[in-house]
């Protein structure tokens, strides 16, 4: 998308681009998987328990995956940077990706049992540079877009607390974002998409259930 969007903005006769896909779907199970097991071969589909294609900007219940924020930044619709982290359990594992595979990074800093292990942090931003801080200590400051446009990849060591990114343009801070480890006071919360429904069979309510702490940090 990052390369295509440059062409779209440059040439007025290009009307847009097509991304597969916005909302994940049932079927074509696992075409967007990242395979950490069969590194010598890569089939089109994935076996059970895969059910969804796993290539959407949003998952089956409509929650946005990190890649959707990267696209939003490219389109010029988001000014604030966005931080996510790749699962440290697979940091050094060889892997295969399909044409539809997206990053497996998630917006979480909850990796119990992985303390002291290496972890990759992804920072999405429309800026020149990004600086990463873990619990207030600077890890590194680097240019954005060295590997992929609008992204800076940082290597650090996981420790509970918070990871924060500060981005700069022309040396001046233009934004920051962070994710925080949820505390141990886990709470289960339910969020309905509407205030009330009729007591009959004519309507439906979707209720999202989440686990997090008192400050709203998801666990």
Language-model features: where?
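Substrate-binding clefts and catalytic carboxylate motifs of secreted carbohydrate-active enzymes
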Residues: 1-201, 214-219
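Short, solvent-exposed loop/turn segments enriched in Ser/Thr/Gly
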Residues: 201-207
């Amino acid at each position: 998308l990052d390369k295509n969007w440059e062409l779209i903005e440059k040439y007025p006769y290009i009307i847009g681009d097509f991304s597969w896909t916005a909302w994940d779907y049932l079927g074509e199970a696992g075409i967007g998987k990242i395979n950490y097991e069969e590194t010598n071969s890569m089939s089109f589909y994935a076996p059970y328990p895969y059910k969804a294609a796993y290539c959407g900007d949003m998952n089956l219940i409509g929650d946005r995956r990190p890649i959707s924020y990267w696209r939003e930044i490219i389109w010029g619709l988001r000014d604030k940077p966005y931080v996510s982290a790749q699962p440290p359990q697979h940091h050094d594992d060889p892997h295969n990706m399909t044409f539809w595979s997206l990053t497996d990074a998630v917006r979480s800093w909850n990796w119990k049992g992985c303390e002291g292990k290496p972890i990759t942090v992804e920072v999405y931003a429309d800026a020149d540079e990004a600086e990463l801080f873990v619990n207030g200590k600077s890890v590194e400051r680097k240019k954005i877009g060295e590997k992929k446009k609008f992204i800076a990849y940082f290597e650090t060591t996981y420790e509970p607390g918070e990871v924060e990114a500060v981005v700069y343009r022309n040396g001046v801070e233009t934004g920051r974002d962070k994710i925080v480890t949820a505390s141990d006071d886990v709470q289960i919360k339910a969020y309905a998409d509407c205030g009330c429904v009729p007591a009959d069979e004519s309507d439906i309510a979707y209720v999202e259930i989440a686990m997090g702490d008192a400050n709203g940090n998801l666990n």
